[in-house]
Amino acid sequence: MGITALAFDFGTKSIGCAIGQSITGTAQALPAFKAQDGIPNWEAIEKCLKEWKPDVVIVGLPLNMDGTEQNLTLLARKFANRLQGRFGVNVHLQDERLTTTQARSEIFERGGFKALKKGKVDGISACLILESWFECTEY
């Protein structure tokens, strides 16, 4: 039996979200959540968690290309810790280097510049984070 996973691509203005199943190893983008000065809309996130009931939550870890941490890395870790503390969910961190670049490339290929909307990029980035977690995790 597979597991249901929910992934977040944390950002200080927008948080991408995706849902996926380990059986297929694929993910589907959900609407992005707005954040204000790095503070997530916890009510909307709680509603999403209740609706999808994930077995595990994945949070993208934004590292520099050389693997070192940046300011956003610390904020993403804090977000992951708060998810676990507030909702009691099992949270894992996943390296997200280049997911935003890859997401923009995929969206541009499908629809050009007009398709490059921030919410779509964040959602597809969350999909890529989740799919990469499925690929490199044994459950």
UniProtKB/Swiss-Prot annotation:
Keywords: Cytoplasm, Hydrolase, Nuclease, Ribosome biogenesis. Gene3D superfamilies: YqgF/RNase H-like domain (3.30.420.140). One of its GO terms (cellular component) is cytosol. Its EC number is 3.1.-.-. It is found in: Cytoplasm. GO terms for biological process: rRNA 5'-end processing. The keyword Cytoplasm applies. The keyword Translocase does not apply. GO terms for molecular function: nuclease activity. Could be a nuclease involved in processing of the 5'-end of pre-16S rRNA. Belongs to the YqgF nuclease family. This is Putative pre-16S rRNA nuclease. It comes from Haemophilus influenzae (strain PittEE).
